[in-house]
UniProtKB/Swiss-Prot annotation:
NCBIfam families: asp_carb_tr, PRK00856.1. This is Aspartate carbamoyltransferase catalytic subunit. Disulfide bonds: none annotated. It comes from Staphylococcus epidermidis (strain ATCC 35984 / DSM 28319 / BCRC 17069 / CCUG 31568 / BM 3577 / RP62A). It is an enzyme of class 2 (transferase). Catalyzes the condensation of carbamoyl phosphate and aspartate to form carbamoyl aspartate and inorganic phosphate, the committed step in the de novo pyrimidine nucleotide biosynthesis pathway.
Length: 293
């Protein structure tokens, strides 16, 4: 694999290969490769806890040496372009770049680089490693995707997770539905929009999305009061109680407790939210291994 930029660039067989390797790392069936003497730099131009720390843990476990990069103290503050920043890191011997950026498809500016790039999120575009860890979590639960009914709820328009998961899960055979305020509908995605209360007792997976307040300021979109949103579109106790016995709840996090999901349900028996985070490290080890081998 040359780069990991978008879920649309991955075939179903490549997806299965990556989640299989990640599952084998997790179970201990597959020994961890060691990339001693190779260097990685994580360039995060947007805030992150899970993705950044998960990549760092994966890199450390694989023996990579981390070249620290902080946007606040870099020449980006002097106006240096993303390409020149990345070309500099390539020139001094960095072997892999992990990049999160607010610009959709930022990687199109970097096609002259000769080192692999792992996209850790581009604006409201794609978040391939999040999608892959979600797929891994679903696979652990069900062993297949064919015919699963998946409801993705929330800020569809501004969510790179919704976009990545829609394409990949549909390709794998799942039935994806959206539930969203009309202000946050994305008409470029062809999944049907439904009322959450009409389907909550029929779905296999409820995938909640964070309300992207930071992107609403840019687009001038309407905001909701927390309780208003929670009652109309969130996972309340009443909705949780209607879920099928074997249904699971997912969220890419960070979670706005009491908004997308009732706080007490974050670690409820059907929740796989922290399992997703655990799987993220193993999945990112699989991605790094595929990019460097």
């Amino acid at each position: 694999m040359e780069h990991l930029l978008s879920m649309e660039h991955l075939s179903n067989s490549e997806i299965y290969d990556l989640i299989t390797i990640a599952c084998q790392f997790k179970s201990g069936e597959r020994p961890l490769p060691q990339f001693n003497g190779q260097y990685v730099s994580n360039l995060f131009f947007e805030n992150s806890t899970r993705t950044k720390c998960s990549f760092e843990m994966a890199e450390q476990k694989l023996g990579l040496k981390l070249i620290n990069f902080e946007t606040s103290t870099s020449s980006v503050k002097k106006g240096e372009s993303l390409y020149d920043t990345c070309k500099t890191l390539e020139s001094i011997g960095v072997d892999l770049l992990v990049i999160r950026h607010s610009q959709n498809s930022y990687y199109e500016e970097l096609n002259q680089l000769n080192i692999p790039i792992a996209n850790a999120g581009d604006g409201s575009g794609q978040h391939p490693t999040q999608s892959l860890l979600d797929i891994m979590t679903i696979y652990e639960e069900y062993g297949s995707f064919e015919g699963l009914n998946i409801l993705i709820c929330g800020d569809i328009k501004n969510s790179r997770v919704a976009r990545s998961n829609y394409h990949s899960l549909t390709s794998l055979g799942a039935n994806v539905m959206f539930s969203s305020p009309k202000e946050w509908v994305d008409n470029t995605l062809e999944a049907p929009y439904v009322e959450i209360d009409e389907v909550i007792d029929k779905v296999d997976i409820v995938m909640l999305l964070r309300v992207q307040h930071e992107r609403h300021g840019i687009s001038g979109e309407a905001n909701f009061a927390a309780e208003e949103y929670h009652q109309q579109f969130g996972l309340t106790q009443a909705r949780y109680d209607k879920l099928k016995e074997e249904a699971i709840v997912m969220h890419p996090a960070p979670v706005n407790r009491g908004v997308e999901i009732k706080s007490e349900l974050v670690e409820a028996p059907k929740s796989r939210i922290f399992k997703q985070m655990e799987n993220g490290m193993y999945l990112r080890m699989a991605v790094i291994s595929a990019l460097l081998q």
